[in-house]
A protein has these predicted regions:
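Accessory cap/linker subdomain of secreted extracellular hydrolases
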Residues: 3-66, 75, 84, 91, ...
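Gly/Ala-rich beta-loop-alpha elbow adjacent to hydrolase catalytic centers
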Residues: 5, 94, 98, 102
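Acidic beta-to-alpha connecting loop that harbors the catalytic carboxylate
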Residues: 97, 311-312, 368-370
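Short glycine-enriched nucleophile-adjacent loop
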Residues: 99-114, 136
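Short mixed-charge
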Residues: 112-132, 330-359, 410-420, 426
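Post-His helix in hydrolase/transferase enzymes
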Residues: 375-387
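Cleavable C-terminal sorting propeptides in eukaryotic secreted/cell-surface proteins
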Residues: 501-535
Length: 535
């Protein structure tokens, strides 16, 4: 399995490196030049290494990102052939915004395959490698705004599979009443793009503005009433905000020095890039057309498509995903329309959701899952993943779906409207690497130095109950003066080990807080750049 950080400037991908500070509460990132003193760090102000953060040095939109990804794969699989699967099949899984860049990528890769095979590709030497494409899996994908926007109001009010009223009826009615104008604006975006930017490259300023304005209007009037009034999590409507789940521990893990060293990366990991996000949004990438057509193209060329949704997600509602699957125009459309919703038998005793499947297309409603489906339902997600890859029916994993004639068609319920009771998501806790998980009063305590922080966890009754061994070790270390954690008060004694790790660039000399790990109290001069360590 390969984890592909794209477009450039997200995750561990970078163009050029720059030294920065990052405020965990505000999200503000500030560049440090060669003469800027390295500031003292605390539980919310961290230093590290990021990409350039130049918005001109990333891909502009899903189509341009797809082109860049193809060039990368041409190099990757030829320079590192041992990473190619034994059967040479390549599949792609993408989540959330991946509902757009997943289809854009996979369809472009297949188009390039066909150009190479019929000798119409006039690219450079060494870019003739055929990518044998197998499956596109989209998890909680926002794929087509025109199709999916009408399903946000019902996800917010009663018709979400749980009877949850996240907003009141007045707000719900306002959301519903906004749908016609929203769709009109999206259609205007698409009509304008069809004339002046049909390939969705973001090359026409008027198209960019019309499409961005359409998305802004729709979001303001259909999505924001939920986020502003419900008090519930955007990615799990059963949970009040801030959400206790899923954990953001990967953020701390991927920024540990030993992890970075093992991966051979010279910078800090970041979950998202404002520059990359803005580059996509500024051209109005969200409401543009073609992603449905891309899915139909893939299906007609024998490539499997699985659309997987969590029924507690508000970001990309599951009923909208169901509508997308029905709206795909492909040679199997009539067969898919005749399919029914079958129970997904995760194991002998648990039903993990519903699936509608015909041939190579499947749509899944995953029970009791928010936006990050594998975190909520790991076994069900794993079974869906493996069954899709190995040409087995999603419902049971016992029937082959590989036949091109008399394709498999699921049977079961006529509608996916099973009503459930939401399960308890557990105790909430504040993880300072993800400030959105913290209540305002916790943030205030962190900022004024009165909080007790252990491995980026805000220490309170909940975290002591949830992570007793971790908290106990931190407190023992503090008592012994070993500093494994962030201590209490103003964090002056013992000196905290820095939570945001990485290395600076260009041989910059700086001062860093070393902590007692090296037996030094205070600051240590570094000749090889800024080295931030964490116990």
């Amino acid at each position: 399995m390969l984890y592909f950080d794209q477009p450039v400037q997200v995750g561990f991908s970078y163009d050029t490196l720059s030294n920065v500070t990052r405020d965990l509460v505000s999200g503000r990132v500030t560049s440090l030049n060669d003469t800027t003193p390295v500031p003292e760090q605390n539980s919310t102000l961290l230093t590290g290494t990021f990409p350039s953060r130049d918005p001109n040095n990333t891909a502009f939109g899903s189509v341009n990102g797809a082109v860049a990804s193809w060039h990368f794969l041409q190099s990757w699989f030829q320079e590192f052939p041992h990473y190619l699967p034994n059967d040479t099949r390549i599949s792609l899984a993408a989540q959330s915004y991946g509902g757009r860049y997943g289809p854009a990528m996979m369809s472009f890769w297949e188009e390039q395959n066909q150009r190479i095979e019929n000798d119409t590709w006039d690219g450079g030497e060494g870019e003739q490698f055929i990518l044998h494409l197998d499956t596109l899996m989209i998890v909680s994908g926002c794929i087509d705004r025109y199709v999916q926007y009408p399903y946000y109001p019902q996800q917010a009010f009663r018709e979400n599979g749980f009877g949850i009223e996240a907003v009141n009826e007045t707000i719900y009615n306002g959301m519903v009443e906004s749908i016609p104008e929203c769709l009109e604006r999206i259609q205007n975006c698409r009509d304008t793009a069809a004339i002046s930017d049909p390939d969705n490259l973001g090359i026409n300023a008027t198209v960019n503005e019309v499409c961005e304005d359409a998305e802004t209007w729709c979001r303001t009037n259909i999505v924001n009433p939920y986020t502003s009034n419900s008090g519930r999590d955007y990615y799990d409507l059963s949970t009040v905000s801030p959400p206790p789940f899923p954990a953001g521990f990967h953020q701390g893990f991927l920024n540990r020095e030993w992890v970075q060293a093992e991966l051979g990366v010279p910078l800090n990991w970041t979950g998202s890039s404002p520059q990359a996000s803005n580059a996509y949004r500024d051209i109005g990438d969200y409401p543009r057309d073609s992603w449905l057509q891309d899915l139909g193209f893939l299906l007609d060329n024998g490539i499997k498509v699985s659309l997987i949704y969590g029924d507690l997600d508000f970001a990309c509602p599951w009923a909208g995903g169901d509508a997308v699957a029905k709206a795909i125009n492909w040679t199997g459309s009539a067969g898919y329309a005749s399919a029914q919703y079958a129970e997904i038998h995760t194991n002998d005793s648990y039903v993990g959701g519903l699936v509608r499947q015909h041939g190579n297309l499947s749509y899944i409603r995953t029970y009791q899952a928010g936006h990050s489906i594998p975190s909520y339902q790991p076994e069900t997600a794993y079974k869906i993943f493996t069954r899709a890859l190995f040409n087995l029916d999603i419902a049971t994993g016992t029937q082959s779906t590989a036949a091109s004639v008399n394709a498999y068609t699921s049977t079961g319920r006529a509608q996916p409207d099973v009503q459930l009771e939401p399960t308890d998501t557990g105790l909430s806790y504040c993880y300072t690497y993800a400030a959105s998980s913290c209540y305002d009063w916790q943030v205030d305590m962190i900022q004024n130095g009165t909080a007790e922080i252990c491995n980026w966890l805000f220490v309170d009754k909940n975290t002591t109950q949830l992570f007793p061994d971790t908290i106990a070790k931190c407190r023992a270390d503090w008592a012994a003066g070993s500093g494994h954690g962030n201590g209490t008060g103003n964090h002056s004694v013992p000196k905290p080990l820095l939570p945001f790790e990485g290395s600076a660039v260009g041989g910059k000399r700086g001062y860093v807080e070393s902590g007692v790990e090296r037996g030094v109290d205070g600051w240590r001069k570094c000749d090889d750049g800024l080295k931030l360590r964490n116990g």
